[in-house]
Amino acid sequence: MDTMTFCVPCLFGLEGLVGDELRRLDLQNVRVEDRRVFFEGDFAAMAKANLCCRMGERVMILLAEFDAHSFEDLFQGVKAVPLERFIPKDGAFPVKGYSLNSQLHSVPDCEAIVKKAAVTRLGEKYGLGWLPETGETYQLRFSIMKDHVELFLDTSGVSLHKRGYRREANLAPLHETMAAAMVNLARYRGRDFFWDPFCGSGTICIEAALIALNRAPGLNRSFMAQKWSCVPETVWQQARTEALDREYRGEYHILGSDIDAASLEIAQQNARKAGVGKLIEFREADATKMSLPADKGLIVCNPPYGERMLEQRSAQRLYSAFGRHLKYADGWKKYIISSEPEFEHYYGKQAVKKRKLYNGRLQCNVYMY
């Protein structure tokens, strides 16, 4: 297969981190745009990105791009794409997409047109008047932005933030991709004492352990393209072997504490599923009263936030108490994510640096001290 262009969508604010990550994986011609990062390569590069990308949401092949001001433009543009290079005669090819600031604004209508064009193209190429779609799934995705269409083939299936270790979560969970981003912002590589004092279901600590080990986050899950006839099985075997060869071994100090015992039980289960249960210590403790576990280290955390007024006031009091507790913890660097716009006021200190991110649709800032 010739060199292809791939697109990795990501949460807003993580584009630069994802770009750096893909470059570290030796992927070629990495290009960063708003909420997505592109690279070029073959199926081996695709498998490596799926297995090893910590902060992207999925890996998609860019099949085509063209302008469309009418449904006929959209139909002809999709019909011209050589879908038969990837989709066999029995392949199932559902369609999902979105449209913004375009003349073709009805997403259901656009999805129907893309589907019709794909059916027409494949029917003609395979000499079939009806396509059974009883085989493996080849998810088509499209975006229409300012009348410019991009057509993609999703190779990941389930979003990459689903690593396969978290089946249960407490309230206000942090996406695994966002947790990995916070650990990367803290520049944690396994040498410092790492502490999440509001660990909840353990996501930040687990992602820290995976990063310390240099363990590929996708080793415990499967991907849509693994079942495709056009992708040799050896591609996936080689990618997994290389990922395992890159792992580190060492002694790490990772602590997750929380005031809620039920959350800690879930955290321990999740850590075991992720294969890092022995690397993380979980402790029941109040973050505003607990003694510092070491003289220096990294604090990376997602304190509780409230959506209703009473919950917001409770969260604000918690930020104040937490700030007072850490007032003299000068040996600790702190990376705290919060959706509270006045977080610095309640915490009692201006951040050295701030970075705007989105946890799903929730606008947040990472406050760095």
What does each model-identified segment do?
Residues 22, 95, 142, 302, ...:
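Residue-level signal for inorganic ion chemistry
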Residues 10, 258, 338:
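Short beta-strand/turn micro-motifs composed of small residues
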Residues 174-291, 307-308, 314:
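Conserved S-adenosyl-L-methionine
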Residues 100-103, 159, 304-308:
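A short, flexible beta-alpha/helix-coil linker loop
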Residues 2-136:
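Non-catalytic nucleic-acid substrate-recognition regions in nucleic-acid-modifying enzymes
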Residues 151-187:
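SAM-dependent Rossmann-like transferase core, predominantly class I methyltransferases
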Residues 140-156, 367:
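C-terminal edge-of-domain segments
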Residues 286-369:
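C-terminal catalytic and target-recognition region of SAM-dependent MTase-like enzymes
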